[in-house]
Amino acid sequence: MVQAEIQHHARISATEPIAAGKPKFLGNIYSTAQLSDFKRYWNQVAPENAGKWGSVEATRDVMSWSSLDAAYKLAKDNNFPFRMHVLVWGNQQPSWIENLPAAEQLQEIREWFAAVAERYPDIDHLEVVNEPISDPPRKVNSADQGSGNYIGALGGSGTTGWDWVLTSFRLAREYFPKSKLIVNEYNLTSSTPRTQQYVGLINLLKAENLIDLVGIQGHYFSTRNVPAATILSNLNLIAATNLPVYITEFDIDDRGLNQTPANRTQADQYQLGEYKRIFPIFWEHPSVQGVTLWGFRPGMWRTDQGAMLVNTDGSERPALAWLREYVSATVTSLHNEMQPSFTLYPNPVTNGRVRIEGTDKIKWIRILDVQGKQLQVHEVAHQSFHSLELPLAPGVYLIQLSDGRTSFTKRLLVP
């Protein structure tokens, strides 16, 4: 599932959003720097900073809604899904709440929830808590500004270890009964222990029917140099919760860590290669129902790292041109749609041979290494099974089956 075969269509629209007509959205953030040509590319909206409590109510009881109003209007005027980012977080929170008594803090949190609910009655996806593992609303020291310092008002760790998150979601269910509730976190695709911790929290929320969606941020610092098999494995752990998954804050730099590209061509090709390696893992996964990029124009938060997809003159970088073509050409399935079932045996491989059952609808079988490099390709011609000779060094590989539209991937162990 590292990269699907792209079929060239005779015509790919350059005037409507990239994912128009697709079962999954491909969205982006609302900010002044990202507005130009937004509707030409994207069909979902999340405010970058406008929905953070510290942006709206920097001064107690003085509300600044204008930017959040504009983000919401952009979504609703164009029938794009709107994700509210974010109610509870340990960053960019009002400084005035930090030293209030806990009971008063809780009352202010309720007022914040109520104000958002009243002003924006049709929020599609409500990000209740952002970064519960990484950045809870706890003041660590005097230099920790913007944390909110209200974790205790929400119950602290409590008996579950996550009482404050559970309270946040209970309040969200109360004030936003029509919205889908989502939690969000980063550095999941690169860390299985962290992913398992996140799944534990999700299961606590599921036990009270408090959560509808799961967010994975997808920033490049969590996918750079991470094997495709690791990304997919951790994504599958989260998908096993049987909740829809959203990639909430996706970006890819045009350089490796602490590396400066020699020239624009090198930068473009690096970013393009990483988009081809990483994006299909998420886009083709049947549990992933949408991807939100965290900016695409100069002025986005990772401009210095070269993550923008559009140049300063407005021209598209190669990764953006590829993204439009790829999404247009790739037919994806969602979790509740019928998917082909295939089995591998023996797995681990014995004597360099493996048999694949259930290939009657399959056109191609590819063997990839864990970095996504294609090692073998086999045409199946709709046979019910296929046997392969695998003269491969010991290790973990990916075996990818494609019906010409969608690909399906499993891990294969060669001892």
Task: Report each predicted region and the residues it spans.
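Boundary/entry segment of secreted carbohydrate-active catalytic domains
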Residues: E5-A50
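Substrate-binding cleft and catalytic face of glycoside hydrolase catalytic domains
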Residues: A33, R40-A58, S66-L188, I252-N258
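Aromatic-rich peripheral "rim/lid" segments of glycoside hydrolase catalytic domains that contact
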Residues: A10-E16, E57, A115, E127, ...
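Short, acidic/polar
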Residues: I29-Y41, Q105-V116, P193-L205, E274-F279
